[in-house]
């Protein structure tokens, strides 16, 4: 936290430039209940995995994404890390391994962390990545209206995309691209009509219709 304020103006300059890296086209997402029917978001992340040799899934959860990756022919090393006890993971803490990774995945984890802990984790991620390695982070979009009306008691800190971009760049990542992720309920005409109306209303209200955001940062 002190590091952020000690470099406040540098971080502010980075934050002010965040809009340049936002991808205008949104990416559809829905749960990976059937590995044969992945969403656009899962296909996007899979492309990054297939280009790597050594992957760390930080906060691997129910391991569905790992199963999806392996079913699609990934031949590299895929390490799963989580503090949970419901599934078998390779690690419970990043300090348990001295390996370097081409890709670190961190899906829907950082909103469970206060800022000082997350900043410390970013530094660890940077040290664990190979030169040119990539970090993928997804988190709820604070600019989405659900942030105001719905919540999760385990979420302790929202991360606006502007600040997340500044933190990534300020902690040694050379570049970052942001994707806007939309929870896609179905392909029915009714949902398309609802979604079109939602886009109009959120524009009027000055909020975003993208439910989540995803960053791909390069070390």
Question: Where in the sequence are the language-model features?
Answer:
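Short, glycine-/aromatic-enriched active-site segment of Class I SAM-dependent methyltransferases
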Residues: 137-156
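Conserved N-terminal segment of class I S-adenosyl-L-methionine
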Residues: 1-99, 103, 116-123, 128, ...
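Short, contiguous strand/loop micro-motifs
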Residues: 32, 112, 150-152
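Hydrophobic adenine-recognition pocket in adenosine-nucleotide-binding enzymes
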Residues: 109-112, 141
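Short alpha-helix
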Residues: 156-172
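A short beta-strand submotif of the Rossmann-like class I SAM-dependent methyltransferase core
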Residues: 103-109
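Short glycine-dipeptide loop
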Residues: 129-135
């Amino acid at each position: 936290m002190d590091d952020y304020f000690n470099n406040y103006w540098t971080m502010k300059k980075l934050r002010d430039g965040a809009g340049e890296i936002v991808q205008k086209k949104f990416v559809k997402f829905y749960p990976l209940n059937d590995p044969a029917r992945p969403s656009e978001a899962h296909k996007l992340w899979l492309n990054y995995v297939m280009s790597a040799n050594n992957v760390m899934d930080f906060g691997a959860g129910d391991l569905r994404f790992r199963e999806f990756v392996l079913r699609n022919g990934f031949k590299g090393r895929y390490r799963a890390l989580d503090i949970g006890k419901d599934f078998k993971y390779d690690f419970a803490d990043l300090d348990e391994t001295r390996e370097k990774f081409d890709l670190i995945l961190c899906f829907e984890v950082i909103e469970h962390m206060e800022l000082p802990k997350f900043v410390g984790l970013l530094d660890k991620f940077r040290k664990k990545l190979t030169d040119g390695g990539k970090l993928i982070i997804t988190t709820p979009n604070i600019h989405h209206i659900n942030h105001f009306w719905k919540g999760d008691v385990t979420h302790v800190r929202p991360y606006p995309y502007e600040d997340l971009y500044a933190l990534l760049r300020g902690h040694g990542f050379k570049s970052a691209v942001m994707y806007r992720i939309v929870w896609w309920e179905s392909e029915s005409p009714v949902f398309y009509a609802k979604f079109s109306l939602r886009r109009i209303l959120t524009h009027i209200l000055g909020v975003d219709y993208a439910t989540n955001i995803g960053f791909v940062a390069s070390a």
